UniProtKB/Swiss-Prot annotation:
Swiss-Prot/TrEMBL keywords: Oxidoreductase, tRNA processing
Alphabetical list of SMART domains matching this protein: RHOD (SM00450)
Catalytic residue positions: 200 (cysteine persulfide intermediate)
Keyword Cell membrane: no
UniProt-annotated stretches for the region Disordered: 315-354
Organism encoding this protein: Klebsiella pneumoniae (strain 342)
EC numbers for this chain: 1.14.-.-
EC class (word): oxidoreductase
GO MF terms held by the record: oxidoreductase activity, acting on paired donors, with incorporation or reduction of molecular oxygen
Protein name: tRNA uridine(34) hydroxylase
Length: 354
């Protein structure tokens, strides 16, 4: 039986990707549909996508598929044709093409089977995830932004909202999508007469969130078709004003796509205008934070003096320190609380209801 997972080191794979000469296209897509056997589907996809030289991250569950990938430009149409024919539910699948792309977003293919393609924490058997809000296209989004009865709700994480969002969009103060869902209902409970517009990066979170709002008695619910990525692309193509301000955070090596020239965030170390995310170079930390070029040089890519000193230690000493920390210091934990603790950033004031 063939090996259906990667067995080459990340370092080697990254070097191979960087040495490639053919341009790559970064694509995201998702689809809610019933997958009877996610593991068998995963294995079949692995074989086909490996042949197409696809890199990236794909999650499968009984509720559907969620993918962020890169593919050689010459294979984009072959990938589209393969997916359209792979399952009837994928016929006509929308590809969200990256707005800014150097082709270096991924260097390894990972396919994982999960309980859900979006961790929503919903265990209500009466919830119908297919009963979603109506789609909004780019022109409709701009019209809604000018409608005083419309409320835009950002269903992304705090670090995504911080660097870019729609004008006057409501931030839901929670560290995870599963925590945002009940908070969104709570914050809008007294405003069921409002028109609610949900949005996220590529559409997968806001689609489910729109169904959750309808499940909780909200009737005027929309979500942006294809999320921020598709909105910005279509608005530019149609010559419409792009009303998203700042940068769109993305979950790959790029960490962001510039949507407007506005820089609305600040360096977490010195406070200078900046919207460049990075991970602390100390392997015992890897805190996700915003760092300007000056502080990157001053702190050698680390988030604090303590991490600078630890990063200077011999690798063996660093490993011993990491092993002695409870839960590995919660590496890759992106919670606002951890960011505030590490960098002394005060907790934001609670978002106001509309």
């Amino acid at each position: 039986m063939p090996v259906l997972h990667n067995r080459i080191s990340n370092e080697t794979l990254k070097a191979q990707m960087l040495a490639e000469t053919e341009p790559r296209t970064t694509i995201s897509f998702y689809k809610y549909f019933t997958i009877v056997d996610p593991q068998a589907t995963r294995d079949a996809l692995w074989v086909a996508l490996t042949q197409l030289k696809v890199f990236g991250r794909i999650y499968l569950a009984r509720e559907g598929i969620n993918a962020q990938i890169s593919v050689p430009e010459s294979n984009v149409e072959a990938l589209r044709e393969f997916l359209y024919g792979f399952d009837p539910a994928l016929a006509g699948l929308r590809f969200n093409i990256a707005l800014e792309d150097d082709g270096k977003s991924f260097w390894v293919l990972r396919l994982k089977v999960r309980d859900r393609i979006v961790a929503d924490g919903i265990d209500d058997p009466s919830f119908d995830a297919s009963n979603v809000g109506d789609y909004l296209k780019a022109a409709d989004v701009n019209a809604m932004l000018d409608d005083p009865d419309a409320v835009f709700i950002d269903m992304r994480n705090h670090y995504e909202y911080e660097v870019g969002h729609f004008e006057n969009a409501l931030e839901i103060p929670a560290d995870t999508f599963r925590d945002q869902l009940p908070k969104a209902v709570e914050m809008m409970q007294d405003h069921k007469d409002k028109k609610i517009v949900m949005y996220c990066t590529g559409g997968i979170r806001c689609e489910k969130a729109s169904a959750w709002m309808k499940h909780n008695g909200f009737n005027k619910v929309w979500h942006i078709e294809g999320g921020i990525i598709e909105y910005a692309r279509r608005a530019r193509e149609q010559g419409l004003p792009v009303r998203f301000i700042g940068k769109n955070f993305v979950f790959d090596e790029r960490m962001g796509e510039r949507i407007s020239d506005d820089v609305i965030a600040h360096c977490h170390q010195c406070g200078a205008p900046c919207d460049t995310h990075t991970n602390c170079l100390n392997d015992g930390c890897h805190l996700l934070f915003i760092q300007c070029p000056s502080c990157a040089e001053k702190f050698a890519g680390c988030c604090s003096e303590a991490c600078v000193e630890e990063h200077k230690l011999p690798e063996e000493e660093q490993r011993k320190l990491r092993a002695g920390r409870e839960n590995g210091n919660k590496i890759f934990n992106k919670s606002r609380g951890r960011l505030n603790t590490k960098l002394g950033i005060p907790e934001p004031e609670s978002s106001e209801k509309p």
